[in-house]
């Protein structure tokens, strides 16, 4: 059994869509101002890397939780390959959509291999994950994230960048076709940010993994993402390719930045995105 086809790409890919989704944490309140998300529509194309941008409290994490099926929308729907998440059994959904949290603090002193094995079947205990297929896929996931040589190290002893790569390996071990990543580089220094960014780019480009990335980092979003969704106060205020979204006046006002976005060739591929604070 293998996670990937012979050409290195995922066995299958999924499309994920939120349509006119609204959500509030306190459903008893009727005021529209209490909505964490209001009439949000986002289409994540299979094999793409979509970035969710916006300030704290704008709804990025809430949208990720809805896409993971952890929360259910009060209005609208979230679908995976045209099928409502409400109709997909929890265990089946967990095998198709994996969540990579901002930070991971395991309760016990697991090894890297054990952490990855637990990602293989999120609803089962570690002792049930000793089958040869599970172990082979765990090792394959570690190899895909460049952490195979860490398999027998204690997770707690790793650097921040190593931990994040192992958490991504654990998500890959679920055999999921969609990864939802919540601020994957937020707590890392620059060297580890670049390390994780390079890994995500490689998994998306070479392995065909569909990703949705919530981040505050405009440079990360510009460098990695095919499309960006900008949220403010629970509403989508801009979305599209990075060259359109990052140069929009709304973005520059919201982040207090000036973005000099340069592209080359007719396809408009990104080459340089220096983003600096506006004076």
Tell me the role of every PLM-derived stretch.
Residues 68:
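Helix-to-loop junction immediately C-terminal to a conserved catalytic motif
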Residues 117, 132-150:
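Conserved ABC ATPase "signature" region
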């Amino acid at each position: 059994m293998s996670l990937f086809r012979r050409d290195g790409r995922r066995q299958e890919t999924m499309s994920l869509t939120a349509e006119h989704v609204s959500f509030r944490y306190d459903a008893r309140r009727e005021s529209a101002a209490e909505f964490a998300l209001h009439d949000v529509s986002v289409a994540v194309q299979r094999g793409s890397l979509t970035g969710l941008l916006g300030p704290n409290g704008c709804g990025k994490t809430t949208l990720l939780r809805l896409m993971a099926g952890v929360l259910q929308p009060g209005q609208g729907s979230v679908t995976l390959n045209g099928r409502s998440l409400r109709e997909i059994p929890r265990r089946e959904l967990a095998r198709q959509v994996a969540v990579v949290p901002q930070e991971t603090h395991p309760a016990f002193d697991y090894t890297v291999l054990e952490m990855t094995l637990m990602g293989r079947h999120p609803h089962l205990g570690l002792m049930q994950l000793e089958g040869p297929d599970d172990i082979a896929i765990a090792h394959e996931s570690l190899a895909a994230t460049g952490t195979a040589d860490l398999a027998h190290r204690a997770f707690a002893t790793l650097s921040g960048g190593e931990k994040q790569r192992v958490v991504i390996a654990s998500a890959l071990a679920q055999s999921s076709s969609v990864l939802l990543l919540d601020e994957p580089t937020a707590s890392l220094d620059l060297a580890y940010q670049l390390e994780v960014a390079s890994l995500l780019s490689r998994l998306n480009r070479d392995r065909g993994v569909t990703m949705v990335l919530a981040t505050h980092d405009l440079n990360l979003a510009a460098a990695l993402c095919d499309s960006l969704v900008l949220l403010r106060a629970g509403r989508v205020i801009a979305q599209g390719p990075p060259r359109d979204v990052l140069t929009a006046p709304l973005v520059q006002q919201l982040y207090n930045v000036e973005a000099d976005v340069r592209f080359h060739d007719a396809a408009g591929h990104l080459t340089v995105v220096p983003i600096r604070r506006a004076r």
